[in-house]
From Swiss-Prot:
Residues holding Zn(2+): C250, C317, C324, C327
Entry annotated with the keyword Transferase: yes
Family membership noted in the UniProt record: Belongs to the RNA polymerase beta' chain family. RpoC2 subfamily.
Name of this chain's protein: DNA-directed RNA polymerase subunit beta'
Highest classification ranks of the organism: Bacteria, Bacillati, Cyanobacteriota, Cyanophyceae, Synechococcales
Length: 1366
């Protein structure tokens, strides 16, 4: 293929070829230059095509480019058809080198596993090494794939596709023909089992499952990402929608510096305008001020070798509430200066939001630090190592567990050849690792050192990993570990290793003992199979009668009756009813009790056992209850169970029938206050049971209730008598006179009642019930142990209703209940009482009720060979119905030995029972025979490869127990390496089972890509979130001094500032200090690692600059520093995912986030402290106030997240349509805000033309018309008025806003007295006239804009010489 270089401005031959083919389509193409195109021979891939199309577009416009692109497409298809490019499974060629590479990796991993088995490296180091080995193998395999295709099949369709950029990339090809590689589990941790096969060879089932972990995560991710990204775009649009290009040039002198990266600017300068003249080496002017930088100029600047260029940027633009054309630069759509009225804010928002879907949401955790082989230096010759004279090294252990040395200073290392040859010199920098010792003889191609570029402190975090035991046995520490007890803040004691060392687990058979078992064998005694090792017994607490129950599952219940109580005078009878079984107790005199708790149930103290079934206290209807004097009840907390009688007496009952109806009034069949007979139908289907006077209650034509009061009715017209018995009436005793000719025969309740015939007296019958002082208690018989609980019953009488209570009912009610209640003494809360049926001892046909307290003991059955418990053998020591005393043994359990061996007991800790013991069996030891005298000592621990005698290695690990002649007895064991500061879960001499945790390794791993990546990170930046544990930042510049505290846990970093003052920063546990002693630091520099808090960073910058510069400059500079930082951070996230966004888009958004300041002190302005206001407005206000000599407002810059910034815009319509609608609108209403409809959103909501694009010019005209005589309205908020209002009302001044505006007469600063005198002399009322009103209208109300100053007042001022004659 041939191509025209994008540099060449002549047309390519292809364009011509196409134009012949499609004459019609290309006829509008302007004639191209006649010079023959230069011939270039190079491969055109995706990138070159892009450049070609871009070149055509730039030089020849859209039509030509479209035609050319079409022709290119035809060309591509034509040749692809001729070449018959296709793709098939056979094109996926697996490189032959794959097997060897995998083999090598396997070998390395086997070696690593072996090191781990011998306790040379820790679990963490093993994991890290395995993962790194596979990562490296994968990389090498990718290279092999590339090499294979390049050499053997360069025209392979898969290779061409990936290589040209048409589809796919190397990482995908790698999975097709290399290996799929390492996968992460759902928690994001890398599984150390990689997928060795590729899709061409096919995956095994295990590999397939592991592989689909990641795939599923990807799918879920994509779904969430779309939503998140959409919301991000919405917030961005909201914050930037009112940024429109409104001015040609804001005339600012501020700019930003764009620095070259590795001497190159790339595309970062293209489309910007220079802020100053650019001068090259020989004072040649490369570009004048305000020149647009195109790619050619950008290359020129690069060639001139300039490190940085000052360019104009939206960040520094001083146009109010918009950006000007020159600060924005090119519109990237057509590579020309942006047009006026272009809505650049929305373009910026969409450019940042749209790629959001392409970012990952993943948060990664790798298992350990991934140290790629960076800067590894190998020896080129065989020779002797020599360190330079100033060399200082310290021991260091790499993350892979390799012992090495770390350089503390920069020095030179030489390898002097043993034979002939040139000396190899290696420059070692501070912090580099050296894998050889001084004066060591080494061979060629040995790894000598790993050079790090400077002492870069990486950001690390603490992580932990468990060490799990692989065999049962006894733990032994190596003395090196030096465990120490650490007490944390909660007072918990943990054991920590101080040094790197091994924990040994020496093999043996570990028996777990049941909770109350005790060993019956002595330490170090011999035991044989079937011997009893330990014994546990179960005893009765109180004693009593034994009952054996049938066994359930693998255990058997033994019940011991400690206490029982029988009701011996009552027969227990069972009745069947339609609701179920009912049990009754019947006494000899025929009184019956209903049993509340049926046999077989459990009850506790205070529960009701039975209730007297008694009809003596049952009424026929509802009525009124009255207590006669003498009847008393106990006070109770709740009346749920009625009122307990304390003193007996008489209960008086007045019957009254109440029908609760709730039906329509039309169904009523009688009249109110009518006398009716018993059996009368009062409402349809409801009949009265007694005769008497009816009272009907109704509400809203709904019948509520009908009351029938029975008795004799006598008409009466004596008012005194009627008054006496009004309301509730009175009780009248027999023989007492009620009225003339009316005497009571029996006790009655007399009430005054109105009937249909007139007023009269109703004599209501009364029933009396006598209540005894105490209820009768049945006879009981007890069986009780000496110590232990006892039972009792008590009888109580309870009244259901209180004095004066009215019971609304048709059916009768029970007034008094007699209950039997259970009482227990000296019981524990968990003891329950069982209800049982017992046969009478004499008459076997009669059942009696018995209440018993049982002690239940569960006895385990024999478990023949449960691996951890050994064989257990359980025996019951009692028989059924036997009587046992307190503390008698009920059952014993013996733990039997499974194999012959020697018993060892663990170290006894004070008073703690022994829970495990160990038997050392024959298979736990091995006898080695040495050819020569053994060179080992008893008690020494050895691993594979150690020498038994001279030249005779051992092939197992363990501890030497005995040496007889040349026979060595070795107890097998397994070492585990623990790193310093690991938490030990076991103590020396403890016994462990397989699978127990031995220790928790604490290690540091690199924070991978700050863990938060992609969308969440972008959101964190743009919302200016405060991270949870942010880095500690330096507040003022100075020299660092690091001091370790006594308790060795925390570090204090001191910074000695220029004025010799000290700032102390205490650093918490687990944070890494990122500075070194004596280092010079600047404000805002990191003292520890961790995510940065942008708000704190701004404070640091501002605090530092505030001391050295004027307020406004300090604010602008600190904001500029922060802006630069934010833009870079956002760019980094997108770049890491391969998305390119032009800086200016991010700048537009960041500008909106940093445009406000917070007023701290209002000075003489009318601003409010705490108010958020644009920095430009404060600047203008302060400038105005300074003319009059007033105190300016003090402020601090603030950073607002995009949501906050959207809610803080001047337009309340825009803010309300975004979030918190009610709050925003209420506040706006209370403050009486006006919305000036500047942005797009407000206008869209109201339905006006938007002030962008074609509507822009109309918008400017409209504003001018609105402004009337004050063209100022275009310049500022509610115009310059806002600035005028910010002054105290006693000053009048107007700042020249633009050169066009004539400067107005300026007041000197008159004193209060001067003003007062002037007012009085000219008869000005101080309440109506305000001097400041002469220079400004008094509000944002346009109707007041034409307000003219008061002519009398003006004259007065001129006469006083306080105002110039103009």
């Amino acid at each position: 293929m041939t191509s025209t270089s994008p540099k060449s401005r002549r047309s390519s031959g292809k364009g011509r070829k196409g134009s012949k083919k499609k004459g019609k389509q290309v006829s509008q193409i302007p004639p191209l230059s006649k010079t023959p195109p230069s011939f270039r021979n190079r491969i055109v891939d995706k990138k070159a095509l892009k450049q070609l199309v871009a070149w055509a577009y730039k030089n020849h416009g859209t039509a030509v480019t479209a035609a050319m692109a079409d022709n290119l497409k035809d060309l591509g298809f034509k040749y692809a058809t001729q070449a018959a490019v296709s793709i098939s499974v056979d094109d996926l060629k697996v490189p032959d080198a794959k097997q060897d590479l995998l083999g090598e990796a396997e070998q390395q991993i086997t070696a690593t596993e072996e090191c781990y088995r011998l306790g040379e490296i820790t679990e963490v180091e093993r994991h890290t090494k395995v993962i790194d080995t596979w990562t490296e193998t994968n990389e090498r395999l990718v290279d092999a794939v590339k090499k294979n295709f390049n050499q053997n099949d360069p025209l392979n369709s898969v290779w061409m596709m990936a290589n040209s950029g048409a589809r796919g990339n190397m990482s995908q090809v790698r999975q097709l023909v290399g290996m799929r590689g390492l996968m992460a589990n759902p928690q994001g941790e890398i599984i150390d089992l990689p997928i060795r096969t590729n899709f061409r060879e096919g995956l095994t089932v295990t590999e397939y499952v592991i592989s689909s972990y990641g795939a599923r995560k990807g799918l879920v991710d994509t779904a969430l990402r779309t939503a998140d990204s959409g919301y991000l775009t919405r917030r961005l649009v909201d914050v930037a929608q009112d940024v429109i290009v409104r001015e040609e040039d804001c005339g600012t002198s501020r700019a930003i510096l764009v620095k070259a990266e590795d001497g190159r600017f790339g595309n970062r300068l293209v489309g910007r305008l220079t802020a100053e003249q650019i001068v090259g080496d020989a004072d040649e002017i490369i570009a004048k001020k305000d020149t647009a930088i195109d790619p050619e100029l950008s290359k020129k600047i690069e060639k001139a070798g300039l490190a940085g260029i000052m360019v104009r940027s939206p960040l520094t633009c001083e146009a109010t509430r918009s950006v000007c054309r020159k600060c924005y630069g090119w519109a990237l759509a057509h590579n020309n200066l942006v047009d006026l009225g272009e809505a650049v804010g929305i373009i910026a928002a969409q450019s940042i939001g749209e790629p959001g879907t392409q970012l990952t949401m993943r948060t990664f955790h790798t298992g350990g630090v991934s140290t790629a082989e960076t800067g590894v230096v190998r020896s080129t010759i065989a020779g002797k190592v020599e360190f330079g004279p100033n060399a200082r090294v310290r021991g260091y252990r790499t993350p892979h567990g390799v012992e090495a040395q770390q350089a503390e200073v920069d020095f030179t290392l030489k390898v002097k050849p043993t034979g002939s040859g040139k000396t190899q010199t290696i420059e070692i920098s501070n912090g580099s690792l050296i894998f050889v010792d001084n004066a060591q003889e080494i061979a060629a191609d040995v790894t000598v050192a790993q050079i790090t570029a400077g002492a870069v402190k990486k950001s690390v975090e603490k992580a932990t990993k468990d060490v799990i035991c692989d065999l049962a046995g006894q733990v032994r520490y190596e003395s090196v570990i030096q465990p120490r007890e650490v007490t944390d803040r909660q007072g918990n004691i943990t054991l920590k290793a101080q040094r790197l060392g091994r924990l040994w687990v020496l093999a043996g058979d570990v028996y777990n003992l049941p909770p109350n078992a005790r060993p019956v064998v002595k330490a170090n005694s011999k035991v044989s199979k079937g011997m009893v090792l330990a014994e546990a017994s179960q005893a009765s607490e109180f004693g009593g009668e034994v009952r054996l129950r049938d066994s359930i599952g693998d255990s058997r219940e033994v019940q011991i009756v400690t206490t029982s109580m029988t009701l011996k005078d009552f027969k227990l009878l069972e009745e069947s009813t339609h609701t179920g079984e009912i049990w009754n107790l019947e006494a000899k005199d025929g009184t019956r009790y209903r049993l509340n708790s049926i046999p077989g149930s459990k009850i506790s103290s205070g529960e009701i056992v039975a209730e007297l079934a008694d009809d003596r206290f049952r009424t026929k209807t509802g009525g009124l209850v009255k207590y006669a004097p003498g009847l008393a009840i106990k006070k109770a907390r709740s009346a749920k169970n009625g009122f307990e009688v304390s003193n007996g007496g008489t209960l008086i009952w007045v019957p009254q029938e109440t029908h609760e109806i709730n039906k329509d009034i039309s169904l009523l069949m009688i009249k109110d206050r009518q006398w009716i007979e018993a059996g009368t139908e009062v409402v349809k289907d409801i009949f009265s049971q007694t005769a008497g006077i009816v009272t009907v209650t109704q509400k809203n034509d709904i019948l509520r209730e009908i009351i029938v009061r029975s008795g004799e009715f006598h008409l009466c017209n004596e008012s005194k008598v009627l008054e006496r018995f009004e309301d509730e009436g009175q009780m009248v005793n027999p023989g007492e006179n009620i009225a003339k000719g009316l005497k009571a025969d029996s006790m009655v309740l007399v009430q005054t009642v109105e009937s249909r015939d007139g007023k009269g007296l109703l004599l209501r019958p009364v029933e009396e019930y006598t209540i005894p002082d105490q209820a009768q208690l049945p006879e009981l018989s007890h069986v009780k142990q000496e110590k232990g609980p006892s039972l009792g019953l008590r009888a109580t009488q309870r009244l259901a209703f209180k004095d004066g209570e009215l019971i609304k009912s048709v059916e009768g009610v029970e007034l008094l209940k007699t209950q039997l209640i259970l009482d227990t003494f000296e019981t524990t809360p968990q003891m329950t009482v069982d209800v049982e049926v017992a046969l009478d001892k004499r008459a076997k046909t009669i059942n009696r009720l018995r209440l018993v307290i049982l002690e239940s003991i569960l006895v385990r059955r024999d478990t023949m060979s449960d691996s951890s418990h050994g064989s257990t053998h359980t025996e019951l020591q009692i028989k059924d119905n036997q009587l046992v005393n307190a503390d008698d043994v009920v059952a014993t359990t013996q733990i039997l030995c499974k194999e012959d061996g020697i018993v060892q007991l663990p170290n006894a800790v004070d008073d703690e029972p022994i829970r495990r013991l160990i038997v050392e069996r024959a298979q736990d030891t091995t006898v080695l025979t040495a050819k020569d005298n053994p060179i080992l000592k008893v008690g020494e621990r050895v691993v594979d490869g150690d020498l038994l005698s001279k030249g005779e290695p051992i092939n197992c690990c363990g501890e030497v127990e005995d040496i007889k002649g040349n026979k060595v007895t070795l107890r097998l064991g397994r070492p585990y390496m623990v790193s310093p500061d690991s938490v030990l879960h076991v103590r020396d001499g403890d016994l462990v089972q397989r699978g127990d945790g031995l220790a928790l390794l604490v290690f540091e791993r690199q924070k991978t890509g700050d863990i938060v990546q992609g969308l969440p990170r972008i959101e964190e930046l743009l919302e200016a979130r405060r991270p949870r544990e942010s880095a500690i930042l330096c507040k003022k510049p100075g020299i660092v001094e690091i001091k370790q505290e006594e308790d060795d846990e925390s570090v204090v970093v001191k910074v000695i500032e220029s004025d010799d003052s000290l700032s102390e920063y205490s650093i918490l546990l687990g944070r890494n200090v990122m500075v070194s002693d004596g280092q010079e630091v600047h404000a805002g520099e990191f003292l520890t690692d961790g995510p940065v808090n942008p708000h704190e960073l701004l404070e640091c910058f501002f605090g530092d600059l505030r001391d050295r510069k004027p307020l406004l400059e300090a604010a602008q500079e600190s904001i500029a520093k922060l802006q630069h930082r934010l833009v870079t951070e956002v760019q980094n996230v997108y770049k890491s995912q391969g998305v390119s966004i032009d800086d200016k888009h991010i700048e537009v958004i960041v500008r909106q986030m940093t445009s406000k300041v917070r007023i701290e002190d209002a000075g003489d302005t009318t601003l409010l402290p705490g108010e958020l206001i644009e920095i430009r407005q404060v600047e203008d206000t302060n400038q105005a106030i300074s003319v009059t000599g007033g105190a300016p407002a003090e402020f601090t810059p603030v950073l607002l997240g995009i949501t906050k910034a959207s809610l803080n815009t001047d337009s309340f319509i825009s803010a309300a349509s975004f979030q918190e609608t009610t709050r925003v609108l209420t506040e706006a209403a209370i403050e009486g805000k006006s919305d000036w409809l500047r942005g797009l959103k407000e206008n869209v909501i109201i339905g006006r033309l938007i002030p962008a694009g074609t509507g822009f010019s109309g918008f400017v005209e409209e504003l001018r018309a609105e402004a009337g005589p004050h063209p100022d309205i275009l310049a500022e908020d509610p115009a310059g008025y806002r600035r005028m209002q910010n002054l105290r009302p006693d000053y009048t001044v107007e700042m020249p806003v633009s050169t066009a505006a004539k400067s107005t007469s300026v007041l000197d600063d008159p004193s209060e007295e001067d003003l007062e005198a002037t007012r009085s002399r000219h008869g000005i009322d101080p309440t109506t006239s305000n001097f400041a009103a002469f220079a400004r209208p008094s509000g944002d109300d346009p109707s007041q804009e034409d307000q003219k100053p008061d002519p009398i007042a003006l004259e007065g001022l001129q006469e006083e010489g306080l105002l110039a004659d103009e």
